[in-house]
Amino acid sequence: YVLIMRLKLKRKIYRADFSEYKGLWSLYNRATDNLYSHLQRALEKYENFGVSAKHKVLQCLVHVVTSQSDNSVRYVYGNIFALVRLGTYVTVWYCYTESAPDFISVDPHYLDIELIIDLFKVRKLFVWIPYEEVISTSILEAYDAVVERTALTDCLDRKLREEELSDKFEFWGKCSDGDHTIDSVEENATIEYASSKEGSACKEGVDSSCKEEGGGCEEEGSGSEEDSDDSDNPRYLAFGVVVLVGVLLYVWYCSR
């Protein structure tokens, strides 16, 4: 009973705090929508495996920090976290953004500003973890393991101090429960990655330039599983030849 009451009280406090910033809800929805669309394009261009890899967003977390200066200019800083599964690996996609401070709010409790997220221009970070090790790991735990976390946090705090911002408000939002498969990508869809030396470097996760530039290893061609023709795969041809030879030998043996 005590636990239930605490949960109800916590939920009521959360709703009360959140209702004061009505625009944050639409901001959060736009942020997650943009994340999925940009992440889809980024994954198609980022060559990190020499073979086909299924990709799916397992978890998504949005951290929004808003502050207001004395002249009622609202500043918005966003931190986007996405736990993405690529084949047998899981990567933590981190994206730091900040909005242009060109919105003057008349009502300090209302926020309606466009948070533009472009994963190709902002700083991003990949943390490669074998999938088996991340099943019970949350995004926050993975984020705590990031070396650059302190530097990014200090950068945000310094920005807030430089602008002499006040009325700081933080909001952690989690994507709704359910299937977080990226839009336009079906459950069993794959991305075909071109085999190259650069691709193998990304696969091992040792090429820092690939990770830092995000989407560095450009591929010769990529497509979905529907676009590929399995009949052209040498492995299938070899298997077919072996089966055919086996059948001929069996027929010859039976006819003796």
Swiss-Prot record:
Basic and acidic residues bias: start-end ranges: 201-214
Record key words, sorted: Mitochondrion, Plasmid
Superkingdom of this protein's organism: Eukaryota
Compartmental location: Mitochondrion
Biased amino acid composition, Acidic residues: 215-231
Annotated Gene Ontology cellular component terms: mitochondrion
Region: Disordered, residue numbers: 201-231
Other facts noted in the record for this chain: These complexes consist of double-stranded linear DNAs with proteins covalently attached to the 5'-termini.
Name the UniProt record assigns to this protein: Uncharacterized 29 kDa protein in mitochondrial S-1 DNA
Species name: Zea mays
Lineage: Eukaryota, Viridiplantae, Streptophyta, Embryophyta, Tracheophyta
